[in-house]
Structure formats: C-alpha cells, structure tokens
Amino acid sequence: MDLSAQTFFSLDQFQHSAIFQGTRYAWEALEALAEYLKKQRLGKIEIELSSSVYLVNKEFISIGKGVMVEPGAYIQGPCIIGNNSIIRHGAYVRGNVITGEACVIGHASEVKHSILLNHACISHFNYVGDSILGNGVNLGAGVKCANFRLDHKLVSVHAGNEKIITRLKKLGAVIGDGTQIGCNCVTNPGAIIGKNVICHPCLTIGGYVPSYGKVKPAQKSIIVEK
C-alpha cells in the first residue's frame, strides 16, 4: 500500500514541500522536522504583535505577512507560521511547528511537533501532536490527535494487512487533504486517514481510513419514552 506523502497531500503550493523529499512514508517528515527547522532562517516576524502575545525563543519564530495573532496567544520557537494564518487568543504553539498559508490555530488549541499544510484549521479546543494535517483539513471542536501509546511501545501503523512498526514513540495522525473530522473525535496514535474523508462526531478513529470514505458510528442513539 502506498503511504507516501503524495498519496495524502497535494504539495505543489506548500512552501515547505522539501521536508517530504526522500521519505517513503508520509509520517517520516516528522522525523526530519526539527532538523529542517534548524536549517531555516528563522526570526523574521512580518507583522505587528500585541504586547500580550507571549513569545518564547523569539529568535527562532518566523511569522509571515498578513498573519493575525490575537492577544493572549503563546508561540514557542522553533516554528514557522505561514502567510495569512490566524492564531487566536489562548492558542498554544509548543514548538517544532510549521503551518502553511491561511491556517487557523484557535482558542484553547494546542499544537506541537506537527505540520499543517495550507488552509488547515484546528479552531476550537483541539490537540494536535506529532501529526500532519493536509490542505483544507478541518478538525471540529474538541478533536484530539492522541500521539502516545499507553504501554509506551513504538507506534505501529495498521493499513490493510500491513503492520508497520515506526521508529517513533510519539506519532499522532496523518490526515489527507480535504478531510473533515467531526466534533469530539479522538484519533488513536498512528491513525492514517486519506483524502476527503468525512468522520462523524464523537468517534474513536484508528488504523487506516481510505480516501473518500466515511466513518460513522456502528449504532445509533435510541429515544424512548420515560
């Protein structure tokens, strides 16, 4: 099964597509992320910031043109915030993060060691750790990308009949372009979700979900008289 970055993402318009070069599996870009950021010329902030925006390791933070950073946001370098993105009040950017253009990191949303391609949105009460979100991905309110196994073993990726043991103790989700995840879903460590998938709310999603699929609950709620 082809689990390369090109299977999940259109990279033509993503400024940092080079991070995927030489990878066999899409998630291998996360292994290269810290080193990739070290090689970038960081520290260029192209907007005016409120005095109540909290910056840590400012010399390793780059913020592009047209970005809106609301008062009360926390941004830790190294990171790159792409042009025309929005970082809302209470957002927590923990470092080793790249966002493409016009991304949204919203109130009470936390992101660390992750890559967000253009127009990806984590707008309300989300956790995104050690994950890659494709172009136009939207996480509904309360969606969490779990990234660490309870038994502390290396994360495995299950796709079809394949079980791929990664080199990673922390791996969240790889979510393909255009996928929409409903409110309060949790993705298990190593979840691989294809392009243009729709996931209904309040589900636990693991393993491999093929592109253009739909994930919905196995049973429906029943309304009865008292």
Regions found by a protein language model. Name each.
Residues 16-19, 107, 113-119, 123-226:
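Glycine-rich hexapeptide-repeat left-handed beta-helix
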Residues 32-83:
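Long amphipathic N-terminal alpha/beta scaffold segment
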